[in-house]
Amino acid sequence: ILTYTMYHAAMEGNTKSVPVNSKDRIINFLPFSHVFERGWAYLGLSVGAELIVNTYPKEIQQSMRETHPTSMAAVPRFWEKVYVAVKERMENSSIVQRKLFYHALNVGRKRNIQYVARGKRVPLTLEMEYKFVNKTVLSLVRKQLGLEDPHIFPTAGAYVSPEVEEFVHSIGINMIVGYGLTESLATVSCDHIGQPYTVGSVGRPIEGIDIKISDEGEIMLKGPTITPGYFRRDTTNAEAFDKDGYFHTGDAGYMKDGELFLKERIKDLFKTSNGKYIAPQMVEAMLLVDKFIEQVSVIADQRKFVAALIVPEFSVLEEWAKENHIEFKNREELCQNKRVNEMMRERIETLQ
């Protein structure tokens, strides 16, 4: 059950944490059935922002270059693909271009992660150097994405790799990492504009949300944006809330210095045959930053080892096979090729 009172409270809380305004151009490409996208669209409408609806998710990057949005709700997989694409382009550039890019990236990381993220005053020399590399290098990277004037880019829905999060901030895009559920009307916590944040956290609670960590380490919620329950499901409702009225999220986490850190989805934990628990999301996120990997599912339940089912990025893999003179009749034959498997195994070893 999601009530209008919950929506009103969510709009008030989010407006203070991530203040979009009437000058923003918000592009929507996630399904509106997804409470994250719907809530972000409502927030934009509530302040008079311009909404740009992209009806073809696969063409989102082209749409961004055409419409130049200042804001967009996205899932981590979108930014993982951006990260991989930019790195690939840089690796194929000249030595001079590559050195310039990585120097600019390091300056951006130092300024935006080591100082701004921690709420520290940026030294004048670093600020001047950042303005120079931002204008000459980083702005060109953002232009390729259609993000010449980035404002707020909330990201949630899955585990965000710290490597990807640092990269996005380093090129000058304000990624707002958050955490939420349908039952909480999306946002529970997020990085707050103008406040310090920690890479790897999912931010601070929005106004009105009370977070409690149970003795078992589960994240428990109470507040005006939390569902009153499930429609006509008395048994489920009795299990969904504790005696103090806190909602069971099913996610494990902890609080540190006012920020929430996720550990894993409790129900998604695997237990190997030797008794070790494995959190698949972190392993999957680590693998997904590789350009050869499109999708991955970690498998470990009741096995002595951790395995992964990988769907390759076939356009990249097929190009690599041609460059390495590997003949194949179809994708199945390509995946079974010994040299392909050796190459993938080496890349996975490097990622670990």
Feature map (PLM): residue ranges:
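Hydrophobic alpha-helical segments in the ANL/AMP-binding
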Residues: V35-A49, V164-E166, S170-I171, T187-D191
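Adenylate-forming
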Residues: Y4-H8, N14, V82-V86, F153, I226, E259-L288, L317-K338, ...
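Conserved AMP-binding/adenylation subdomain of ANL enzymes
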Residues: M6-R25, F32-S139, D149
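Active-site loops of AMP-binding adenylate-forming
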Residues: Y159-V160, H169-N174, L181-G200, R233-T236, ...
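Conserved ATP-binding/catalytic segment of the ANL
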Residues: P205-T272, V289
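Conserved A3 ("GATE") glycine/threonine-rich loop of ANL adenylate-forming enzymes
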Residues: R77, A156-V164, V177-H192, I206-G208, ...
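C-terminal boundary motif of the adenylate-forming
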Residues: A252, D290-S315
